[in-house]
């Protein structure tokens, strides 16, 4: 059994794997580069750093550890499925982007999820405030640096998974939520499922993620590459502030800071408690 055990530095793929990967390269439409063009639309700025340090002193986020992917999309990694490599390169978008001119922005590449920022009459409405306090705080600082400082008037949790609410304490003070200066909006059942899903299934979900995404492997063509919907989950200070307003009906309309939003409850889709938001 000598040399049959796992080598943390990786090893070259077998001829069978290479044959399979080459088959996908010839079958799928990799010549279509539109997604790469669209992924860079509206780019405003990237921060001067690639790491975000957690309050505990560990590295909460390290975008630089994935730069092996930027050798160029035409680089062939026989150890990575071609579709995963393509998606991993697309997920290297890092910084502040304009989505709807002078109205809607996104910070991408700071966590597994993106933070979406809506410009109200006087302040910011934040959608999905990332996994941890440190990455969310850094994202908001980037927004205020390039778009002008505004206070946060509302936060919207789209659903009950931690990468969409765990960074809330990095962008708002709980005292301002309690005194009514900041609203937090979430779908009905949010608190129940945000807590219960982690209590009942959290250990199993984390264990699954280690196998599913290779989270404990070195970041390399032979190890951890991407999580497909994003690079990874930030490893910082996760928190939760209870919503002040629940969307309980199938369809509800709400105007905050001059911005009209139409909410549609969609429970049991990607999460047990979830909703869509439409801007008329």
Say what each PLM segment does:
Residues 74-86, 142-145, 152, 174-176, ...:
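Non-globular, low-confidence helical/coil segments that flank catalytic cores
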Residues 81-99, 237, 249:
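Short acidic, Pro/Gly- and aromatic-enriched capping/linker segments at domain boundaries
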Residues 267, 279-280:
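Structured mid-domain segments that build the active-site/substrate or prosthetic-cofactor binding neighborhood
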Residues 1-88:
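N-terminal pre-domain segments of enzymes
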Residues 111-114, 131-134, 160-163, 190-193, ...:
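Solvent-exposed loop/turn segments at secondary-structure junctions
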Residues 122-123, 133-185:
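Active-site metal-binding motif and surrounding structural segment of the metallo-beta-lactamase
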Residues 99, 185, 189-268, 272-273:
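Metallo-beta-lactamase
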């Amino acid at each position: 059994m000598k040399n049959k055990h796992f080598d943390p530095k990786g090893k070259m793929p077998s001829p069978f794997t290479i044959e399979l990967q080459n088959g996908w390269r010839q079958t799928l439409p990799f010549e279509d580069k539109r997604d790469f063009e669209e992924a860079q639309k509206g780019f405003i700025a990237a921060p001067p750093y690639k790491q975000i340090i957690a309050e505990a002193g560990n590295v909460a986020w390290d975008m630089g550890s994935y730069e092996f992917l930027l050798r160029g999309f035409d680089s062939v990694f026989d150890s990575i499925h071609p579709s995963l490599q393509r998606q991993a390169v697309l997920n290297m978008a890092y910084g502040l982007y304009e989505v709807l001119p002078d109205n809607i922005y996104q910070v991408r590449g700071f966590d597994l999820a993106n933070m979406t920022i809506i410009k109200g009459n006087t302040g910011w409405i934040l959608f999905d405030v990332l996994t941890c306090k440190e990455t969310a705080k850094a994202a908001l600082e980037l927004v205020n640096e390039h778009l002008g400082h505004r206070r946060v008037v509302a936060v919207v949790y789209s659903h009950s998974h931690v990468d969409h609410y765990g960074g809330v304490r990095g962008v708002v003070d709980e005292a301002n939520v309690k005194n009514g200066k900041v609203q937090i909006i979430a779908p009905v059942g949010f608190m129940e499922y945000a807590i219960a899903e982690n209590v009942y299934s959290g250990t199993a979900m984390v264990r699954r993620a280690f196998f599913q995404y290779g989270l404990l492997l070195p970041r390399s063509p032979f190890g951890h590459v991407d999580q497909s919907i994003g690079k990874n989950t930030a490893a910082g200070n996760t928190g939760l502030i209870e919503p002040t307003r629940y969307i309980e009906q199938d369809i509800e309309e709400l105007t905050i800071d001059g911005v009209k939003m139409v909410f549609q409850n969609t429970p049991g889709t990607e999460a047990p408690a979830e909703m869509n938001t439409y801007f008329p």
